[in-house]
Amino acid sequence: LYLLFQAIREHSTVALSGESADEVFGGYLQFFDEEARRAETFPWLVRFGRDFGDDADVLRPDLTEALDLESYVADGYRTAVAGVRRLDGESDFEYRMRRICHLHLTRFVRVLLDRKDRASMAVGLEVRVPYCDHRLVEYVYNAPWSLKSFDGREKSLLREATADLIPKSVYDRVKSPYPSTQDPKYAIALQDHAKDLLARPAHPVFDLVDRERVHRAAHRDSPQITQASRRGLERTLDLALWLDMYAPDVLLT
C-alpha cells in the first residue's frame, strides 16, 4: 500500500479510496459465511482463525493464558453489540446481519482507515474516503440485508445503484481481497530475518513469543511455508523491531 501511494504521489496530491464500501454494503466473505454469521464473536475472527490456524499464533502459551485473550475478545464483542437496537418487526436473521454490519463499521474499518492514513501521509498524499460520508452510512445502514444482497452477491445495492455509470466489466467483477505478496522470495527473506533473530537468544522478543514456533517456521522448507506461517513470522519480526526502536518496559505479572 505504501508503494502504491508512493507511485500515485508522483502524479497527484489527492486520491480516492474505497474504505467502508464493503462495511456499509456487505462486501466481505464473512457476510456470506454461515459459520461467521452464527458465531457470537467478531465474524472476521472466525474466518481468520479458519484460514490461518495455529501457525499464526506465536505468543508464548503461558502468556496467552495469563492475558486471557478469549475473555478479552468476548467482552469486547458484548460491548460492541450492546448498543445495536433491534428494529420493530425485524427478523432474527436481519437483526444479526445488521449487527455484523455495525461491527465492521465500528471495529473493523477503523483499522483500515488508520493504515490508509499512515501510509498516505508518509508520502504526502491526501486520500479521501467518499464511502465514509456519514450521510451515506446513515442512509444505507438500516437497509435490510435482503435488499443489500438481493441478487445473492456482494455489494448488490451499490452495484445496481451505479449500473448506468460504470462499465459492465466492473459491474460483473467479483470482489478481489486485498492482495498479499506471492513471490516466494519474500517468505525466504522472512525466514532469513527470523533466523538472525533466533541467533540472538537474549532478545526481549522471546519473553513474548514462542521460540520453538518461530524456529519451526523459520526452518520450514520453502514450498511448505503457508500464509499462516508467514503471518507468524511477520508478527514476530514486527514485534522485535518495535522493541528495538522504542525499548519499552514490558512488565509481565
Would you name each region that the model predicts?
Residues 1-3, 9, 30-40, 91-94, ...:
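ATP-dependent adenylate-handling ligase core
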Residues 3, 23-24, 157:
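Phosphate- and divalent-cation-binding pockets in alpha/beta enzyme and binding domains
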Residues 12-28:
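Short acidic/histidine-rich active-site segments
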Residues 24-50:
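A mobile, often basic/glycine-rich helix-loop segment
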Residues 10, 14-16, 47-253:
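Adenosyl-5′-phosphate
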